Curated annotation (Swiss-Prot):
Gene3D superfamilies: Leucine-rich Repeat Variant
Chief location category: cytoplasm
Protein name per Swiss-Prot or TrEMBL: Proteasome activator complex subunit 4B
Signal sequence interval, chain numbering: none
């Protein structure tokens, strides 16, 4: 097969779409595809060499995408590589228009997709061009200023592209060199660098290259990940990178040392609620890991000699299992369900790769690490429990069903039986229908695994019949969802099973296995099943007849639910009949025929369902069925229409309608079988098409449509699960062997219906007989020669439309001359013709053209004479649509069928073996879809004059009087616009005519229609926004000018809304249009390689030299033209804006359009600059806002480039960098830090200083070339008025004009929305640009204003001055020393004034101002500012509030400087330390936050040296010594501090309490922000916190107690390193001996959270587990009742999440405690039941009972083997004294509650004697009184 094909093609295809080989015309496709490929290669190569990106290259790359959809990768490997290289060159053209880049990128992704087709030897692509492209778009320096407009989708397209590329082996090192210097954890560059690593680092390399691959970075990244404790945003990216690495290199990466840490972090990432009162750090929710990658990582680590991961995975599932129980719900549930659903799928994918996939160049998994059968079994076992629980989850059963489908593929014998155990009872129950829905949907997914049985699960098939029979009651008219799932269930099972009675084989054959004999005898029930199913359906139909269900008025449509039931019913019935043997079919046919012919149904609901069932029958075996139905119906109809008057009646007899309906459905069968009945059918059509009654003739039209369609279309006729059906005798063929058998793609034996000559003749005979006369009548009517009533016209149109629908596939498409001159191109833009199995007969009448001609005449006649005949217009619009596009199928039907095909495929696929092992019916469906797709692929059709006429008619309809007509016509118009090449350019001017202000004859309806035409629909073309200068230059000015049209009225809300939508859509969809269309030489060279390639040889060779020169000239001319068009568009919009009569709305729209036209590669024309600068002082706020953004962008355009030079850091520091990686503060980067003794304070120091502005350089490692700004002498001079360009002069003139500035500042200091305003970054950019470009030229004018604003404490004035100051400081980056010094001399006093006027509303703005001013600036340049802020933040002058604000502002500045100001941080800390005992809460909170930032730099990251900034450890030591009085004292700590500072110094203790309050604020603030937690230091504070934290939740507690509780909650969730755990446990043990029971109680709550959030890390050390266990068991015997109960709860939790195991030693320990003897009560103490102080014995006995109770409650959803005995032990204590009795009762009541649901299966675990006792206990009422 392959050989012959290679001979025809001349090459071996890379990978083609196999379904093409099964089409009825498959033998023609190789020639066709080679033709098209040669055409694509020739034209694409030529277009690239002629440098014609648009339309040439774009047109032919689109054709290439279409080729991929039609034939797959059907080209040679050489061509494949050439295409990829060419597209790679095109994608990475610098300055390429973004929409072109995206369209090339999507195609490139498609070409790179199947990794296995091209190895690294075949193809390597450089990574840098792609990185430059990605960087320029995702981190664009100009996008935020509005100089570039990118679509939202671009990010994902580029990411996918990067992931698909293959890079050379040297790339890893180059990437590390490029991005390592960005790894500064305090900076945003960290996120960027890790993001790049995740995206770009290659992980598929052969093992011998691993040293040049992941081994270069693995340890470094892994250590970084392990050492970060507080989940920064980039941690997720690292996880994604590790997951990809693991998946691509199974067996080559040793994960073992990290496994406990990995699983601990995965568990933390679910954010599950633990314990009683938990505070969640918000960052944990936003930055948690992506489940898809977690799943990939886990599934790649499983297996291997130790299989460590499986042990951890067991632990993971047992620790979260109970969260899956349906009674639990929360926002974490979605994540857990996703884990459940995806993990089995991921393992199946891995097994497929290891065992079944064809080997290719990618390194296979080494056999030591492949999953063994035991590994798979262990995996399935570990997932079974959670999945079975999740079946009934609140989120629905879909996730569980998908999980079970995959688990059943691997181990059917483990998962199917337990699901069956739940399914059978669910089928019996009447009260819980949701159980049925859930179990059936799970069974559907497992159907194939159940049926195929196999050696592991041979008893599977035996369940089929019992399941099918029991499912029948689910067909229930009263419960819709039950009905649907039952249909789906029955259909799924019957598709897989031939319904043939094989019982007779028991006598004939003696070689059957036991199982086969059982199935043979069971199959005798099939007939019974089919008949019972039919009875159920009949009952369903009877209960849904129309009369019962609704009023007369709503009769038109079935309700949505009814139509779904109809669909379910008909498809299930049709599946059943397809799978029946002939014997069973005949019985069923008889039954359905009798039902249909002995009753008369109304045609809307019941009638449709019955007719569907009859259609299903006749489709399966047409000959047998038609023999019954056709004569019956024809006789009935002939008989009923015998009377003359019938044809004129308005209402027809029900029986007549029903027979017509029945006939119209049963004729939807194989056309060949219809031919014997053709005379009868034609006779009926002649009788009924002219009936007066609309319902009557509509049914007749359906009959006409179906008869034509059955004979004219190409379609498969059988969908049986086995080719050839089941009619062979049992001796030679035993159907039970085919249960669950997949279709064999290579022997599908599809039976196609291809129209024979006889059928074709019949089709045209019908058209001549029935269509011709209608066309003639309509034509005479349209010419005014014959009167017709509207109803008659409509009836004729109905017949015409149904003829088109029926015979459309045989009528050749409309043809004629092409419309030329729309787009100049040097490349051939022809359409590709696809063969779809029909050879059009040119000798016959071309009805498509005839209909077209008549319809156009009729349309014009109706629009002239009776425009209100909307029904006829609707019909004509439908017909026009079909004339243009219909070749036998509709696009929307195709789309929904493709969707449902994918769904069915998913629900029944076998991902384990792969190889397209779908069932036969599905494969046939897919082949048919391939055929339909070929019919519908119409993009890039030539635009012919016929189409032009039809489009103009549609436009006329789209702007007609009635809105419904307009909207229907518009939808057809939009589809057409997307179909024909360049037709938009022809239509747009016609649409715009309606908006022309000079025209007075335009009605409001036409105006609105035209606007809708511009707007487009949500999926089609939007004429207002075609990415092309010609179109935009026409439409935008026209939209603005339409504001002057007489038809425009702003009083009509609908018109106002239309303009809003239009402007909004343009803004949303606009992408920067290219101006530069240069094609680089590399691409031209590759174009030449494509035209010179062979197999297939391109249609045309390399262009001649003169053509190439002409191409270059045209391309240069095109660039110039683009610039001119751009300038003209700007000019036109400005002209519109000059018009004084333009309404304000249109002025705003125009300014909006203008602001979209700012670009970073071409300066805005001067008049527009003038306009925007003037608009800064416009009256309307909207305009001012747009102007501010625009002027900021213009200033960026005018920014002059600064010269940069490389420097060598080692020369400056005089230190050579060490060989090994050393990050952090080291001698080599000390010169970057702030040293107050060596600041540049004079001109020469300043000039000699090497300033490094970006904060991250030098922290982690140095870049290959460190670029810094060249000395001032080499930089461009300041702007002088005589050297300015026109644009620069305009800005200069305005900003040196005092009146302009006056007005501007007045506007800027107005408030916009009260209380909502914030520091505005746009305004900041404006001022930054002014001071950057013009140095200090505008200061003299602005100074007086700034001084005035700073003195005014109003919110908006303060904000305004803050924005100016931030812009000024950042803008002064390159000023000379003299100017900078003068600037600070002015600013420092100004800022002092302003900061003393700070208010609640403005402190955030001042913080932003200073933070913005310090961002990415060398601290040594800002030393004036930093020193001013450091002066005295807590002077106390302005009261506590001003102090807090000063701190906030200072913090903003220092935080931006990160690690470069250790000296300032030390100074600040020593300044703050004595003030930590501050009284005021707001100052305390602020100090807490500032401390977090001071210690932020003290991180424990790998390869990082200890910081020079303050260390937490030393600070904590000092604090602890001050807190001594509290730690040592034993009495309760009360918050009894007097808030005013009393006279004299208070005692140490009061001071310590005040200090503690601040320290708590600091601990709370740092929990979510710092990277690493100083555990050893925090531990020393724990005893103190435990002492204070209250036990109950009560908001009335004072701040101190609440904070202490919060701190404990946050600390207990912290991630611990293994070496820290023993330290924590030691402290907890110590506190457990404390005298305060509150502290002992809190130890337990702390322990619960800490253990769960560090589960696997603690489990990996046996010693720690024993420590925890000892602690809990010790506290079980605490003297305080509350502590004992909490200990029991804790123990139960630890047992439940499998942290501790229930072993015999624990059981005997508790049983022994229970037997503690209690002292006898004395008789005379009857009054006092108990001594108030519990005796030691009572406590011990209670501890034992609590222990047993904890064990019982730790298994809420099942009954382990040890449980019955413990329940017996417990019951012995029912009559003990309190509190024991209470505990026992509570336990029993809980046990009853949690085990009640599944008591039937739990009962099995107990012996009869135990059950007697238990029933007594659980039922006797007194215990629950």
């Amino acid at each position: 097969m392959k050989k012959e094909q290679a001979e025809i093609l001349g090459f071996v295809p890379q990978k083609e779409i196999v379904y093409n080989k099964l089409l009825p015309y498959a033998d023609q496709l190789d020639r066709e595809s080679n033709d098209i490929l040669a055409q694509i290669k020739g034209n694409l190569g030529r277009a690239v060499q002629l440098r014609e990106l648009w339309p040439g290259v774009l047109f032919w790359t689109r054709k290439l995408s279409t080729y991929l959809r039609l034939y797959g990768r059907k080209f040679s490997k050489e061509d494949h590589v050439l295409f990829i290289k060419l597209l790679y060159e095109l994608v990475t053209i610098p300055k390429l228009e973004i929409s072109m880049m995206q369209s090339f990128a999507r195609l490139l992704v498609n070409l790179l997709k199947k990794k296995e087709l091209l190895s690294r030897d075949d193809l390597e692509l450089p990574w840098r061009p792609l990185y430059d492209l990605y960087e320029s778009i995702l981190y664009s320096k100009t996008e935020h200023l509005g100089l570039n407009w990118f679509p939202n989708s671009v990010e994902n397209v580029l990411k996918t592209l990067v992931k698909s590329c293959r890079v050379p082996e040297s790339a890893t090192q180059e990437m590390l060199d490029e991005w390592r210097p960005l790894l500064c954890p305090f900076d945003v560059t960290m996120q960027k660098a890790i993001g790049y690593f995740e995206l770009f680092l290659p992980t598929i390399m052969p093992p011998e290259q691993h040293d040049k691959g992941f081994k270069l970075w693995f340890d470094e990244m892994m250590n970084l990940w392990v050492s970060v404790q507080n989940l920064p945003a980039w941690e997720g990216n690292l996880v994604n990178l590790f997951a990809r690495l693991a998946n691509d290199n199974i067996g080559y990466v040793n994960w073992d040392p990290y496994i406990p840490k990995i699983f601990t972090r995965i568990l933390r990432s679910f954010n599950l609620p633990v314990g009683t009162s938990q505070m969640v750090v918000p960052r944990y929710l936003t930055n948690s890991y992506d489940i898809g990658h977690v799943v990939l990582w886990i599934s790649s680590m499983l297996g291997g000699p130790q299989n460590q991961s499986q042990k951890q995975l067991n632990g993971l599932f047992s620790s979260i299992a109970s969260f899956y129980h349906p009674s639990n719900n929360g926002r974490w549930l979605m994540k857990l369900m996703k884990l459940l659903q995806r993990l089995p799928a991921s393992i199946v994918r891995r097994l497929h790769r290891e065992r079944y996939k064809k080997p290719c160049w990618i390194t296979p998994v080494p056999s030591t690490h492949k999953l063994t059968d035991q590994d798979v079994t262990d995996f399935v076992e570990s997932m079974k429990q959670p999945v079975l629980m999740a079946m009934f989850s609140k989120t629905g059963s879909m996730d569980a069903a998908q999980a079970l489908q995959n688990l059943a593929l691997m181990r059917p014998e483990l998962v199917i039986p337990p699901v069956l155990e739940k399914t059978y009872p669910a089928m019996e129950t009447l009260t819980e229908p949701h159980q049925l829905t859930a179990t059936l949907s799970c069974m559907i997914g497992m159907a194939r695994s159940l049926l195929s049985g196999g050696r592991h699960y041979p008893e599977g098939p035996a369940h089929v019949l019992p399941l099918l029979m029991r499912a029948l009651p689910g067909v229930d008219p009263n419960d819709f969802s039950k009905c649907m799932i039952t249909f789906q269930f029955i259909a799924t099972f019957t598709t897989l099973v031939p319904l043939v009675d094989c019982s007779s084989a028991l006598h004939d054959k003696n070689d059957l296995t036991e199982m086969e004999r059982e199935l043979c005898s069971a199959s005798a029930e099939f007939e019974d099943f089919v008949l019972q199913f039919m009875d159920r359906c009949f009952a369903l139909i009877d209960s849904s007849t129309l009369e019962q269900t609704r009023e007369e008025t709503e009769t038109e449509k079935m309700t949505h639910l009814e139509s779904l039931v109809e669909l379910g019913l008909s498809s299930t019935f049709s599946t059943i009949l397809t799978q029946c043997s002939m014997e069973i079919f005949k019985v069923a046919l008889e039954k359905v025929f009798n039902f249909a012919t002995t009753n008369i149904f109304e045609t809307r609901v019941a009638g449709r369902m019955v007719a569907d069932m009859c259609r299903a029958a006749s489709k399966c075996h047409p000959a047998e069925s038609l023999r019954l139905f056709v004569p019956h119906c024809c006789n009935a109809i002939t008989h009923l229409t015998a009377n003359e008057d019938v044809s004129n009646e308005e209402e027809l007899d029900k029986e007549l309608l029903w027979n017509l309906q029945l006939l119209s459905e049963v004729t939807r069968v194989d056309g060949e079988k219809l031919l014997p009945y053709r005379t009868q059918l034609v006779q009926i059509l002649q009788l009924t098409l002219r009936l007066r009654c609309k319902q009557g003739y509509s049914l007749a039209c359906n009959l006409l449509h179906h008869v034509l369609r059955s004979t004219a279309l190409i379609y498969p006729t059988d969908y049986c699960s086995v080719p050839g059906g089941f009619s062979r005798p049992l001796q030679e063929y035993l159907p039970i062997k085919d249960w669950g058998r997949p279709g064999d793609l290579w022997n599908l034996e599809i039976q196609w219906h291809v129209p024979s000559t006889e059928e074709t003749a019949f089709v045209f005979y019908v058209l001549d007989l029935l269509l011709q006369p209608e066309l003639q009548r309509l034509q005479r009517y349209a010419q005014g020669e014959q009167e017709m009533s509207r109803d008659d016209v409509l009836q004729s149109l109905c017949i015409v439309q149904h003829c088109l629908l029926g015979a459309g596939s045989m009528l050749p498409p409309l043809d004629g001359s092409t419309v030329t001159g729309l787009v100049p191109s040097m490349v051939n833009l022809e359409e590709t013709k696809l063969y779809i199995g029909v050879d059009y007969d040119q000798s016959r009448e071309n009805y498509r053209e005839a209909v077209c001609k008549v319809m156009r005449q009729l349309l014009h006649y109706i629009l002239e004479h009776s425009e209100d005949d909307t029904k006829s217009l609707f019909a004509i619009i439908k017909i026009i649509s079909d004339l243009m596009h219909f070749k036998g199928s509709h696009k929307h039907e195709f789309d929904s069928r493709w969707k449902s095909f994918t769904l069915v495929k998913k629900s029944m696929e076998n991902r384990l073996h792969g190889k397209k092992q779908h069932i036969r019916a599905l494969l046939i469906d897919r082949v048919l879809l391939q055929h339909e797709m070929r019919k519908l692929l119409v993009e890039g059709c030539e635009y012919k004059t016929v189409h032009q006429d039809l489009l103009r008619d549609l436009l006329r309809l789209s702007t007609s009087t009635y809105s419904q007509v307009r909207s229907k016509a518009q939808n057809v118009l939009f589809t057409a616009l997307g179909t024909y090449n360049f037709c938009c350019r022809d239509i747009t001017p016609r649409v715009l005519e309606f908006l022309e202000p000079t025209r007075t004859d335009v009605t409001q309806q036409q105006f609105k229609g035209a606007l809708y035409c511009l707007l487009g629909n949500h999926c089609g073309v939007c004429l207002a926004n075609l990415h092309d200068w010609d179109c935009i230059a026409q439409t935008w000015p026209a939209i603005v000018r339409s504001g002057l049209s007489s038809a425009m009225s702003l009083e009509k809300p609908s018109i106002v809304r239309l303009f809003d939508d239009l402007a909004d859509k343009v803004h949303r969809q606009y992408e920067t249009i290219g101006i530069d269309f240069t094609v680089p030489e590399n691409a031209v060279f590759l174009g030449r390689s494509i035209t010179n390639s062979s197999q297939p040889t391109p249609h045309m060779g390399t262009p001649e030299d003169q053509e190439l020169q002409q191409g270059l000239a045209v391309q240069q001319a095109k660039n110039r033209e683009a610039e001119q068009k751009y300038e003209k568009l700007v000019k036109d919009l400005l002209e519109c804006l000059d018009d004084r009569d333009l309404p304000w709305k249109f002025e705003h729209i125009a300014i909006g359009f203008l602001s979209l036209l700012l670009r970073d590669d071409y300066p805005l024309p001067a008049p527009a600059v003038f306009f925007f600068v003037q608009s800064l002082n416009h009256d309307a706020l909207v305009v001012r806002k747009m102007a501010i953004a625009a002027v900021a962008g213009i200033l960026k355009q005018l920014k002059r480039p600064r010269k940069k030079i490389p420097v060598n850091p080692c020369d400056i520091s005089g230190v050579t960098e060490p060989e090994e990686l050393e990050a952090g503060d080291r001698p080599g980067n000390d010169w970057l830090q702030y040293h107050s003794e060596s600041l540049p304070n004079s001109q020469q120091d300043w000039d000699a200083f090497c300033f490094v502005e970006k904060t991250h350089w030098g922290y982690y490692s140095w870049p290959k070339k460190l670029m810094v700004y060249a000395p001032a002498a080499e930089q461009p001079k300041d702007l002088a008025p005589d050297t300015m360009s026109e644009r620069e002069a305009i800005i200069n003139d305005h900003f040196t004009d005092p009146t302009f500035i006056n007005q501007l500042i007045k506007f800027l200091s107005l408030e916009d929305r009260k209380g909502k305003d914030k520091f505005n970054p746009r305004r900041f950019c404006l001022f930054k640009g002014l001071f950057r470009n013009y140095s200090d030229a505008f200061l003299p004018v602005l100074k007086p204003h700034m001084e005035r604003l700073a003195n005014d404490s109003h919110e908006s004035t303060q904000r305004c001055v803050a924005e100016i100051i931030a812009g000024l400081i950042r803008g002064s980056k390159h000023w000379s020393f003299g100017k900078v010094e003068a600037l600070w001399a002015f600013l420092i006093p100004l800022m002092r004034t302003a900061l003393s006027n700070i208010t609640v509303e403005t402190y955030a703005d001042w913080g932003t101002c200073v933070a913005t001013a310090c961002e990415s600036r060398d601290p040594r340049k800002l030393h004036w500012l930093l020193e001013m802020l450091m002066e005295c933040p807590l002077s106390g002058e302005g009261g506590s509030f001003v102090d807090a604000c000063h701190l906030y502002v200072l913090q903003g500045g220092l935080a931006q400087q990160e690690w470069r100001v250790p000296e300032l941080l030390h100074r600040l800390l020593s300044y703050l330390e004595p003030k930590l005992t501050q009284v005021y809460k707001n100052v305390r909170e602020r100090i807490g936050s500032v401390l977090t930032y001071i210690f932020m730099i003290d991180v424990a990251l790998p390869y990082t040296l200890p910081t020079k900034s303050p260390h937490i450890a030393e600070f904590t030591e000092r604090i602890l010594s001050q807190l001594k009085p509290l730690i040592e004292g034993d009495e309760e700590i009360q918050n009894h501090v007097v808030e005013e500072n009393g006279v004299g110094e208070q005692d140490e203790r009061t001071q310590a309490i005040k200090l503690l309050k601040t320290v708590l604020k600091w601990l709370m603030a740092s929990a979510g922000r710092s990277f690493s937690t100083p555990v050893p230091q925090q531990l020393q504070l724990l005893p103190l916190l435990f002492k204070i934290a209250p036990v109950e939740n009560d908001d009335s507690y004072d701040e101190l107690k609440r904070d202490a509780k919060t701190c404990l909650s946050l600390m207990s969730q912290g991630l611990l390193y293994p070496e820290q755990i023993p330290m924590v446990l030691a402290v907890l043990h110590e506190i457990a001996g404390s005298s305060s029971w509150h502290a002992r109680y809190s130890v337990l709550t702390y322990l619960q959270t800490m253990v769960f959030y560090n589960l696997f890390t603690i489990l990996s050390s046996e010693q720690c587990v024993q420590g925890v266990r000892a602690l809990v068991i010790r506290l079980l015997e605490d003297e305080q009742l509350e502590v004992r109960e909490m200990a029991a709860t804790t123990l139960s939790g630890f047992l439940q999440c499998n942290f501790l195991a229930m072993d015999s030693s624990m059981q005997t320990h508790f049983e022994a405690l229970c037997k503690t003897r209690l002292p006898k009560k004395r008789k005379r103490d009857v009054g006092s039941v108990m001594d108030t102080i519990p005796s030691v014995d009572l406590v011990r006995r209670h501890a034992g009972v609590l222990g047993l109770s904890a064990c019982i409650l730790s298994s809420p959803y099942d009954v382990p083997t040890w449980m019955p005995q413990l329940l017996m032990d417990l019951s012995a204590h029912l009559n003990d004294t309190q509190p024991i009795e209470m505990t026992v009762k509570k336990t029993l009541s809980n046990f009853r509650r949690t085990h009640h649901d599944n008591w039937l299966e739990h009962k099995q675990q107990f012996t009869d004697d135990q059950l007697v006792v238990l029933t007594d206990l659980l039922v006797s009422p007194c215990y629950y009184a």
